[in-house]
Amino acid sequence: MFLSPGEGPATEGGGLGPGEEAPKKKHRRNRTTFTTYQLHQLERAFEASHYPDVYSREELAAKVHLPEVRVQVWFQNRRAKWRRQERLESGSGAVAAPXLPEAPALPFARPPAMSLPLEPWLGPGPPAVPGLPRLLGPGPGLQASFGPHAFAPTFADGFALEEASLRLLAKEHAQALDRAWPPA
Protein backbone atom coordinates (compact mmCIF):
# COMPACT_ATOMS: atom_id res chain seq x y z
CA MET A 1 0.00 0.00 0.00
CA PHE A 2 1.41 3.31 -1.07
CA LEU A 3 0.49 6.61 0.55
CA SER A 4 0.26 9.79 -1.42
CA PRO A 5 1.69 13.02 -0.01
CA GLY A 6 -0.54 14.46 2.71
CA GLU A 7 -1.81 11.04 3.77
CA GLY A 8 -0.59 8.87 6.55
CA PRO A 9 -0.68 8.56 10.29
CA ALA A 10 0.40 12.15 10.90
CA THR A 11 -2.56 13.63 9.07
CA GLU A 12 -5.30 11.06 9.43
CA GLY A 13 -6.15 11.52 13.10
CA GLY A 14 -4.48 14.60 14.43
CA GLY A 15 -3.31 16.63 11.46
CA LEU A 16 -5.03 19.51 9.75
CA GLY A 17 -6.89 18.91 6.53
CA PRO A 18 -7.41 21.46 3.79
CA GLY A 19 -9.34 24.49 5.05
CA GLU A 20 -8.97 23.56 8.73
CA GLU A 21 -7.54 25.96 11.28
CA ALA A 22 -5.46 25.12 14.31
CA PRO A 23 -7.65 24.66 17.40
CA LYS A 24 -7.67 27.86 19.44
CA LYS A 25 -6.47 27.74 23.00
CA LYS A 26 -9.10 28.52 25.59
CA HIS A 27 -8.80 32.12 26.70
CA ARG A 28 -7.96 32.38 30.38
CA ARG A 29 -8.79 35.67 32.06
CA ASN A 30 -6.02 37.27 34.07
CA ARG A 31 -6.45 37.61 37.82
CA THR A 32 -7.97 40.96 38.80
CA THR A 33 -5.75 43.13 40.96
CA PHE A 34 -7.80 45.51 43.07
CA THR A 35 -6.51 48.88 44.19
CA THR A 36 -6.64 49.88 47.85
CA TYR A 37 -9.47 52.28 47.06
CA GLN A 38 -11.48 49.58 45.29
CA LEU A 39 -11.00 47.13 48.16
CA HIS A 40 -11.99 49.79 50.69
CA GLN A 41 -15.18 50.61 48.78
CA LEU A 42 -16.02 46.92 48.25
CA GLU A 43 -15.50 46.14 51.96
CA ARG A 44 -17.67 49.12 52.97
CA ALA A 45 -20.42 47.87 50.68
CA PHE A 46 -20.03 44.35 52.12
CA GLU A 47 -20.47 45.74 55.65
CA ALA A 48 -23.72 47.35 54.51
CA SER A 49 -25.05 44.24 52.76
CA HIS A 50 -23.62 40.82 52.01
CA TYR A 51 -26.11 40.42 49.15
CA PRO A 52 -26.34 43.73 47.24
CA ASP A 53 -28.90 43.86 44.46
CA VAL A 54 -27.89 44.34 40.83
CA TYR A 55 -28.50 48.11 40.96
CA SER A 56 -26.22 48.50 43.99
CA ARG A 57 -23.56 46.37 42.32
CA GLU A 58 -23.77 48.41 39.10
CA GLU A 59 -23.53 51.65 41.07
CA LEU A 60 -20.53 50.35 43.03
CA ALA A 61 -18.90 49.03 39.84
CA ALA A 62 -19.17 52.46 38.23
CA LYS A 63 -17.79 54.10 41.37
CA VAL A 64 -14.70 51.87 41.52
CA HIS A 65 -14.26 51.57 37.72
CA LEU A 66 -14.75 47.79 37.50
CA PRO A 67 -17.12 45.69 35.41
CA GLU A 68 -20.24 44.68 37.34
CA VAL A 69 -19.39 41.01 36.87
CA ARG A 70 -16.07 41.54 38.71
CA VAL A 71 -17.97 43.16 41.61
CA GLN A 72 -20.43 40.26 41.62
CA VAL A 73 -17.63 37.69 41.76
CA TRP A 74 -15.86 39.70 44.49
CA PHE A 75 -19.03 39.55 46.63
CA GLN A 76 -19.35 35.79 46.03
CA ASN A 77 -15.76 35.27 47.13
CA ARG A 78 -16.12 37.64 50.10
CA ARG A 79 -19.25 35.82 51.31
CA ALA A 80 -17.37 32.51 51.08
CA LYS A 81 -14.52 34.00 53.12
CA TRP A 82 -17.02 35.38 55.67
CA ARG A 83 -18.73 31.98 56.03
CA ARG A 84 -15.34 30.29 56.44
CA GLN A 85 -14.38 32.77 59.17
CA GLU A 86 -17.73 32.28 60.91
CA ARG A 87 -17.22 28.51 60.83
CA LEU A 88 -13.72 28.83 62.29
CA GLU A 89 -14.90 31.20 65.03
CA SER A 90 -17.81 28.97 65.99
CA GLY A 91 -15.58 25.88 65.82
CA SER A 92 -12.97 27.34 68.17
CA GLY A 93 -15.48 27.63 71.04
CA ALA A 94 -16.35 24.91 73.52
CA VAL A 95 -17.93 21.97 71.72
CA ALA A 96 -18.89 20.01 74.84
CA ALA A 97 -22.31 21.60 75.28
CA PRO A 98 -24.65 21.72 72.27
CA UNK A 99 -25.37 25.40 72.99
CA LEU A 100 -25.84 28.07 70.40
CA PRO A 101 -23.32 30.92 70.03
CA GLU A 102 -23.78 33.87 72.32
CA ALA A 103 -24.68 37.38 71.21
CA PRO A 104 -21.08 38.68 70.73
CA ALA A 105 -20.93 36.76 67.44
CA LEU A 106 -23.64 39.11 66.16
CA PRO A 107 -22.90 42.82 65.63
CA PHE A 108 -26.09 44.16 67.18
CA ALA A 109 -26.62 44.45 70.93
CA ARG A 110 -28.92 42.12 72.82
CA PRO A 111 -29.92 42.11 76.50
CA PRO A 112 -27.63 39.72 78.42
CA ALA A 113 -30.51 37.50 79.53
CA MET A 114 -31.38 36.60 75.92
CA SER A 115 -29.10 34.23 74.07
CA LEU A 116 -29.47 33.02 70.54
CA PRO A 117 -32.79 31.36 70.17
CA LEU A 118 -34.32 34.68 69.24
CA GLU A 119 -37.84 33.38 69.57
CA PRO A 120 -39.03 31.31 72.53
CA TRP A 121 -40.44 28.58 70.28
CA LEU A 122 -36.97 27.91 68.84
CA GLY A 123 -35.31 26.95 72.09
CA PRO A 124 -35.11 23.62 73.89
CA GLY A 125 -37.39 24.81 76.71
CA PRO A 126 -41.15 24.35 77.03
CA PRO A 127 -43.40 25.67 74.26
CA ALA A 128 -44.04 29.42 74.31
CA VAL A 129 -47.78 28.88 73.98
CA PRO A 130 -49.31 25.98 75.91
CA GLY A 131 -50.81 23.42 73.56
CA LEU A 132 -48.51 24.32 70.62
CA PRO A 133 -45.51 22.05 69.94
CA ARG A 134 -42.00 23.40 69.63
CA LEU A 135 -40.73 23.64 66.07
CA LEU A 136 -37.13 22.59 66.73
CA GLY A 137 -35.93 19.53 68.55
CA PRO A 138 -37.80 16.48 69.73
CA GLY A 139 -40.28 16.60 72.57
CA PRO A 140 -39.57 14.67 75.78
CA GLY A 141 -41.78 11.77 74.66
CA LEU A 142 -39.93 11.37 71.37
CA GLN A 143 -36.54 11.61 73.02
CA ALA A 144 -37.43 8.86 75.48
CA SER A 145 -38.70 6.54 72.75
CA PHE A 146 -35.67 7.00 70.45
CA GLY A 147 -32.95 7.19 73.08
CA PRO A 148 -30.69 10.05 74.15
CA HIS A 149 -28.49 10.08 71.02
CA ALA A 150 -31.18 9.66 68.38
CA PHE A 151 -31.29 13.37 67.58
CA ALA A 152 -27.87 14.82 66.91
CA PRO A 153 -27.57 18.51 67.81
CA THR A 154 -25.85 19.35 64.52
CA PHE A 155 -29.02 19.80 62.46
CA ALA A 156 -30.82 21.98 65.01
CA ASP A 157 -27.67 23.99 65.72
CA GLY A 158 -26.98 24.48 62.03
CA PHE A 159 -30.57 25.50 61.43
CA ALA A 160 -30.48 28.03 64.27
CA LEU A 161 -27.13 29.39 63.08
CA GLU A 162 -28.49 29.73 59.55
CA GLU A 163 -31.56 31.49 60.92
CA ALA A 164 -29.39 33.87 62.93
CA SER A 165 -27.35 34.57 59.81
CA LEU A 166 -30.51 35.28 57.80
CA ARG A 167 -31.82 37.57 60.55
CA LEU A 168 -28.53 39.47 60.45
CA LEU A 169 -28.73 39.78 56.66
CA ALA A 170 -32.31 41.04 56.91
CA LYS A 171 -31.26 43.62 59.50
CA GLU A 172 -28.35 44.75 57.30
CA HIS A 173 -30.66 45.01 54.32
CA ALA A 174 -33.17 47.08 56.32
CA GLN A 175 -30.38 49.39 57.48
CA ALA A 176 -29.15 49.78 53.92
CA LEU A 177 -32.67 50.66 52.80
CA ASP A 178 -32.97 53.19 55.61
CA ARG A 179 -29.75 54.86 54.45
CA ALA A 180 -30.82 54.77 50.80
CA TRP A 181 -34.33 56.18 51.31
CA PRO A 182 -34.57 58.42 54.39
CA PRO A 183 -38.14 59.09 55.56
CA ALA A 184 -39.62 62.29 54.18
Curated annotation (Swiss-Prot):
One MF annotation (Gene Ontology) recorded for this entry: RNA polymerase II cis-regulatory region sequence-specific DNA binding
Record bears the keyword Lipoprotein: no
Alphabetized Pfam families for the sequence: Homeodomain (PF00046)
SMART domains per the UniProt record, alphabetical: HOX
Domain notes: The Homeobox transactivates the Ret-1 element in the presence of CRX and NRL.
GO cellular component assignments: nucleus
Function: May be involved in modulating the expression of photoreceptor specific genes. Binds to the Ret-1 and Bat-1 element within the rhodopsin promoter.
Region (Disordered) location: 1-33
Quaternary organization: Interacts with CRX.
CDD domains: homeodomain (cd00086)
Leader sequence segment: none
UniProt keyword annotation of Aminoacyl-tRNA synthetase present: no
Gene responsible for this protein: RAX2
Subcellular location: Nucleus
Biased composition (Low complexity): 1-10
Gene Ontology BP term (one): visual perception
Name of the protein: Retina and anterior neural fold homeobox protein 2
SUPFAM superfamilies according to UniProt: Homeodomain-like (SSF46689)
DNA-binding region coordinates: 27-86
Organism: Gorilla gorilla gorilla
